[in-house]
Amino acid sequence: MNHARIAELLQPFLGISGNAVISSELCPSEPAEAGKKPALLSPLQLQLISTYIDILVRWNARINLTSIRDPEEIVTRHFGESLFAACHLFPSGSSVPRLSQASVSSVPCSGVKDFARPRVADLGSGAGLPGLPIKLWAPHIALTLIESNQKKATFLREVTRTLILTDVNVYPDRAETLATPSGFDLVTLRAVERFAEVVSIAARLVAPAGRLALLIGTSQLHQAQTILPDFSWQEPLAVPISHSRILLVGHRYC
């Protein structure tokens, strides 16, 4: 797929509102020259996303990874939503986040975690979304893709191998069998069947003071907040170019 077209389709999702400075390969900190649009994606990242899409389209003809067949819709519906979450979860991108005093005090726990290599789990990863796009945005994370469907797990290994991604582990079993003594710093989950059951499983994987990020429909907002009272929820963020999708992030209390 044409790299310029991918960048154009993804731009609405990477445009962080306000005057925040994004220090990342994806969102450079240098201001754009007058009359020029910022280069939101590096050539390497565009190539990786393009290759990822090619693999996804090819495998999707054999196994059901997504009901979406149009490559451009795959970019907006899947990669756009995933990178929107990535920009908000890791606003420093490839840099190790530096917490301000205000952000430290907002964490509902007395201890501050080491953010040098956050442990991230993507539950029910399927086609690798949002986990792998988050990894492309924040390559310093250690990512675990949890997918019990063996064919989909094989696909995830193929993408990881082809893109030469490090610190990515594919766990081909149910999350309930995953041994996580200290939990994950971040767990991601997109809208799934049996939402109430699965979101409870996701919450149990989150370490104290860790985060749970849900890409869900607005109809599931109240349900998530009610089921998980042990989390301090941020205001939900509307996903661009969507009438009903939101990003909901909660911090787990110690």
Where are these regions (language model features)?
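Conserved class I S-adenosyl-L-methionine
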Residues: F115-G124
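Hydrophobic alpha-helical segments in the ANL/AMP-binding
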Residues: S82, L132-P133
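Conserved SAM/SAH-binding loop
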Residues: A127
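S-adenosylmethionine
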Residues: G131, W137-C254
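Class I SAM-dependent transferase core
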Residues: M1-I22, K36-G93, L99, F115, ...
